[in-house]
Amino acid sequence: MAPRLEFKLTPPPGPHPGIGVIGAGFIVADCHLPAYKHAGFTVNSLWSRDQTKAKAVASRHGIGTVHSDWRQLLDDKQVRVVDVAVPPNAQPEVILEACTRPHIQGILAQKPLAMDPATASILVTACEKAGKVLVVNQNMRHDQAVRSCSNLIRSGWLGKPVLATIDLRAIPHWMPWSEGLRSLTTYILSVHHLDTFRAWLGTPDRVMASTRTDPRTNFPHTDGINIYILEYDQGPRALGIDDVWTAPLKPSSPMDTTCPGNQSVRFRVEGTLGWAEGTIGWPSWPARQPSTLDFASRSDPGTIHRPRWREVWFPDAFAGPMSELLWQLRGGPEAELCGRDNLQTIALCEAVLQSGKSRQTAIVSDYMPQN
């Protein structure tokens, strides 16, 4: 018999503290807020630099207050938890400011927490000193197939992990703010897969990365296509391929009808007792396409298990990180996605970035802040 798969985290019971959201882009409007509403969370205020957009999003989701300034939202005593949904280069200022508000108990930051390990460490330390619960919205860990695969690994169903792979051939929802950052694919997209490998196997010891600019996009960047190998002293290996402007689709136009495209994200984990493999459904967004998982083990000879669910990563999995934060505020366990843990994901991103630049193996611990 297969182990029980907890493919989603149960939200804590209400009443819930008031949530204020800073930002009103598509990921907030179409993922954060629908997921929070379905989970029964209380979002009572919103801010966006584009006030027209903020008012439209608030009206759509029944949010009563639209603030004219993000600092005004932080001053709102009805806000106990802040969902910071701004670009990564703007996020540190907001988090540090939130640390100065005594009534704010929790902060949900977006991934990447920061664009370099040193800044990320400053934010984590500031939240700890201020007594704020900091959780990073690495929501791929709450994708239903990814989370179920984590269950299989932790239960020992697959035996000792041997090899894990993630192969992405898809175009993410690139935002204009991603242009001009010190890293493109590594910190904005690969961060999802690197964090998932950490959830499955732990933090690796070494990284070998190959990266190149992608001729299919139209703005300057350094890390376009990423290929990386993660090495663990205890034995496992992981391989990631992030082809983020996959041919033949054009990055800023409809599908090229002269050569139909085929976007996909596939993963596989092999252990000494079994295997698990599946697909990630987000490339079909806005259509609801659940991720899939198939697995087998010597513990259940002759059977391939194929659990399925109706939930999808976009938007349903977005309730997971906020649930972790709210459970911790209620006295539950420390969030798996806590800021301190995320420093290892940021260090891993930096190791991949530097390995790709130097064409040499990078030691992940070299990029961990020493505090």
Name these PLM-found stretches.
Residues 1-15, 81-83, 324-371:
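C-terminal helix-rich "cap/oligomerization" subdomain common to oxidoreductases
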Residues 2-61:
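N-terminal Rossmann-like dinucleotide-binding module
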Residues 2-5, 188-285, 319-333, 350, ...:
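Contiguous beta-strand/loop segments that form the cofactor/metal-binding neighborhood of enzyme cores
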Residues 27, 49-50, 310-323, 340:
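Active-site loop of classical SDR/Rossmann-like NAD(P)-dependent oxidoreductases
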Residues 28, 67, 107-109, 134-136, ...:
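Hydrophobic residues in well-ordered beta-strands that form the structural core
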Residues 50, 61-126:
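Beta-loop-alpha module in the N-terminal Rossmann-like domain of NAD(P)-dependent dehydrogenases
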Residues 125-132, 147-161, 268-271:
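Basic phosphate/pyrophosphate-binding loop/patch that engages nucleotide-derived ligands
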Residues 140-228, 359:
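Predominantly a Rossmann-like dinucleotide-binding segment in NAD(P)-dependent oxidoreductases
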